[in-house]
Amino acid sequence: MKADIHPVYEAIDATCSCGNVIKTRSTLTGPLSLDVCNECHPFYTGKQKTLDIGGRVDKFKSRFGAFGATKAKQD
């Protein structure tokens, strides 16, 4: 194997927008800024919102449900 072909893998601090600091290793130099982390992301904190899209489906079916259906023959 060739010597000195791999980048330096150093310990850095990744700082989240909420102030949480995570120590990690990377080829990047200097501190890293994160938008979200496990301390502030809604999925991990349990504050996630569940969207109810059932109303949209019902609205679509009411508008286009009969589209393409054959008309009943009149006697």
UniProtKB/Swiss-Prot annotation:
One GO location term (cellular component): ribonucleoprotein complex
Gene Ontology annotations of biological process type: translation
InterPro entries, per the entry: Ribosomal_bL28/bL31-like_sf, Ribosomal_bL31, Ribosomal_bL31_A, Ribosomal_bL31_sf
SUPFAM superfamilies per UniProt: L28p-like
Binding residue positions for Zn(2+): 16, 18, 37, 40
Cofactor list: Zn(2+)
Disulfide linkage: none
Record Pfam families: Ribosomal_L31
Cofactor-binding details, from the entry: Binds 1 zinc ion per subunit.
UniProt key word Metal-binding: yes
Any one GO MF annotation of this record: metal ion binding
Keyword vocabulary terms for this entry: Metal-binding, Ribonucleoprotein, Ribosomal protein, RNA-binding, rRNA-binding, Zinc
Family the entry assigns: Belongs to the bacterial ribosomal protein bL31 family. Type A subfamily.
PANTHER family xref list: 50S RIBOSOMAL PROTEIN L31, CHLOROPLASTIC, LARGE RIBOSOMAL SUBUNIT PROTEIN BL31A
Primary role: Binds the 23S rRNA.
Subunit annotation: Part of the 50S ribosomal subunit.
Annotated protein name in UniProt: Large ribosomal subunit protein bL31
Organism: Pseudomonas syringae pv. tomato (strain ATCC BAA-871 / DC3000)
Lineage of producing organism: Bacteria, Pseudomonadati, Pseudomonadota, Gammaproteobacteria, Pseudomonadales
Gene: rpmE
